[in-house]
Amino acid sequence: VIRNLLAATAVLMIATAAQAQEPARGGPATDVPLLPGAQLAADCGNLLSLSGSAFCVTAPLGEIGTLADAYIADLETRQWLAAGGDDNRVVFVKRRDGGGCDGLQMQAFYDTSKADVTATDPGYLAFATIPGDICAAQPASPAAPPAAAGTVPQ
């Protein structure tokens, strides 16, 4: 049990560091179910250029937080660990059987171009994979060039 906790902690620390920047978007997450209260939004509301690159669902904006919590709980039952993110995005990691980690991100959004947004306006959740092994070691910073022969290091 302690070994699993240590491994999970290490995964979270590595993934958080790896995801400090906006992660690259892979393709739509294909294993995310349509939970109660969500409706499929194949075009992702034609917002954020997500159509075709993410699996999107919609619900009234006033309910999107509760729906996001339900998706987080559902993903946790399938071994996805919340590892980072920001105000409107959660990054998840999942250990691969052969080593390394898969990444998934959930982003909440709505149409910010509207002047008067209400709780009944559509809110969206987009799910997309993060390409590559997100637990892979980050490249080390380049070493300082060696001092030229005959010079005194400073």
Please report, for each region that a protein language model flagged, where it lies by residue:
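Bacterial N-terminal signal peptides that target proteins for export
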Residues: 1-9
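An acidic-aromatic pocket/loop used at catalytic or ligand-binding sites
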Residues: 4, 20-154
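N-terminal signal peptide c-region/cleavage motif recognized by signal peptidases
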Residues: 15-17
